[in-house]
Amino acid sequence: MCKCGVEFRLGVLSKPNQKNMNKKYYYYIIFGITFLLFNLVQDNIRPNYDGGNSLIIYFLGVIPNFLPGIGLPSFFYVIIPEVFKPHSFFFKERLKLSIYISMFGLISNEFITIFTPGRGIFDWNDILWTLIGGGLFLTIHRKIN
């Protein structure tokens, strides 16, 4: 290791503290990928799918709820530290809050479809897959950390 804190391990330059600093970028990448896929499915694949496979139709129906269930908590998880101070309640509880806020918003959006005709169709499967997406985010978070 040199004086600047950089060491050479297995042919790769690394800084010991750099690993923790770059973890937030995983969450930005997760957010970007999920919302890119969301738009791809919602705007291109679903409207143009003419097949009769009921399983594919089912998954094309729930993916727009599943992907934001992963992406929104990921986004909130990295945004909360940018807004709140490190010793605040929001900073300390950012994992729970990011999941709670995302799930509340996404599930509320699904219930709004009951009262707004033409905005969508209420479906319990969408709520289930939103919760599964939130659970997958929690699993991904545990793997990252």
Where are these regions (language model features)?
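Bulky hydrophobic segments
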Residues: 3, 20-145
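Short, Lys/Arg-enriched N-terminal segments with co-localized hydrophobic residues
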Residues: 3-5, 9-20
